[in-house]
Amino acid sequence: MSVASEMREMSVEALDDKMKALYQEAFNLRFQHATAQLENTSRIRQVRREIALIKTVIGERKAKEEV
């Protein structure tokens, strides 16, 4: 199952919780990167894309509710 389909099955509350956790992780990754402690720099990109995917799924649900 893809990440997008898994997120589409999650509730909005669960998506919000996951997004908050990802924002915190992104902050920590940026801090580690700035202090040259980050080994896996590609994780920054992965986290950014997961946040974007969550925002997209939430937007799809809001658009669907308005119709």
Swiss-Prot record:
InterPro entries: Ribosomal_protein_uL29, Ribosomal_uL29, Ribosomal_uL29_sf. Keywords: Ribonucleoprotein, Ribosomal protein. Pfam families: Ribosomal_L29 (PF00831). GO terms for cellular component: cytosolic large ribosomal subunit. GO terms for molecular function: structural constituent of ribosome. Gene3D superfamilies: 1.10.287.310. GO terms for biological process: translation. Belongs to the universal ribosomal protein uL29 family. This is Large ribosomal subunit protein uL29.
